[in-house]
UniProtKB/Swiss-Prot annotation:
Cofactor: Zn(2+)
Gene3D superfamilies: Ribonuclease Z/Hydroxyacylglutathione hydrolase-like
Pathway as given in its UniProt record: Secondary metabolite metabolism; methylglyoxal degradation; (R)-lactate from methylglyoxal: step 2/2
Role this protein plays: Thiolesterase that catalyzes the hydrolysis of S-D-lactoyl-glutathione to form glutathione and D-lactic acid.
Assembly description: Monomer.
Annotated EC: 3.1.2.6
Highest taxon of the lineage: Bacteria
Family matches, as CDD domains: hydroxyacylglutathione_hydrolase_MBL-fold (cd07723)
Gene: gloB
Binding note for cofactor: Binds 2 Zn(2+) ions per subunit.
Protein name in UniProt: Hydroxyacylglutathione hydrolase
Keywords from the named record: Hydrolase, Metal-binding, Zinc
């Protein structure tokens, strides 16, 4: 049973900010605030009191609201120890396996280098909620700005190993273009084709495609399928090292 209330805020062209609130205590965290004003307005409208900010990585579209929200609320800012020098206003640092308590709701920290070297995710197991920033997207993954293909593949495998019913809350609304790309390299994937229809219907109705179930991602996201025999066959890389398959997939997406 979920211990969290989750409120999703769409900002900029395609970013998502998340407010997560412990139902038992009212403690509330903001995850990846690119902007302050929409967060403060949403919290006031909901009657939620912000106590924490959780950053997944240092990019400004995930941290731009840190200091203004902290000044307005006195909240504690939490992020990866190795990126402390790049996270505005940080108060507390965490590493792999650390636990972060938002009231009685607890998240496990998972290090996910690749998009950036200091990227982390927060997994609230009791609520089946994964906040993964720009590592894993719905039907895609983040670009490799700092890390290697091997690092990113290892990070994605760590996330893929979580329970299939986990809800994936990522940092951007990229699902539709991600699926358009995926269909060019994995066109016979029935799970992917079914998702394409669902996603088109959601976007036509003006609705978000995030969150997505991790089990659906495992079946349809090409970046989670680099070690899948049928994906390797479809991609013309049967028997190849999954890191090489992932790297080739990422390169094709970068130039799509």
């Amino acid at each position: 049973m979920s211990t969290l209330d989750i409120h999703q805020i769409a900002v900029l062209s395609d970013n998502y900010i998340y407010l997560v609130r412990c139902r038992a205590t009212g403690a509330c965290a903001v995850i990846d605030p690119s902007l302050a004003e929409p967060v403060l307005a949403a919290a006031e409208s909901l009657g939620w009191t912000i106590t924490h900010i959780l950053n997944t990585h240092h990019h400004y579209d995930h941290t731009g609201g840190n200091e203004e929200i902290k000044a307005a609320t006195g909240c504690e800012i939490i992020g990866f120890a190795g990126d402390a020098h790049r996270l505005p206003g940080i108060d507390r640092t965490v590493v792999e396996g650390d636990r972060v308590a938002i009231g009685q709701a607890e998240a496990r920290v998972i290090e996910t280098p690749g998009h950036t070297l200091g990227h982390i995710a927060y997994w609230f197991a009791e609520s089946s909620a994964l906040f993964c920033g720009d590592t894993l997207f719905s039907a895609g993954c983040g670009r490799l700005f700092e890390g290697s293909a091997g690092q990113m593949w290892d990070s994605l495998r760590k996330l893929r190993a979580l329970p299939a019913q986990t809800l994936v809350f990522c940092g951007h609304e990229y699902t539709q273009p991600n699926i358009t790309f995926a269909l060019t390299i994995d066109p016979r994937n029935e799970a992917l084709r079914a998702r394409a229809l669902e996603v088109d219907a959601l976007r036509a109705a003006g609705r978000p495609t995030v969150p997505a179930f991790l089990g659906d991602e495992a079946r349809s996201n090409p970046f989670l399928r680099a070690d899948s025999a049928d994906f390797q066959e479809a991609f013309g890389m049967t028997g190849a090292d999954p890191v090489e398959v992932f790297a080739r997939t990422r390169l094709k997406k970068d130039h799509f």
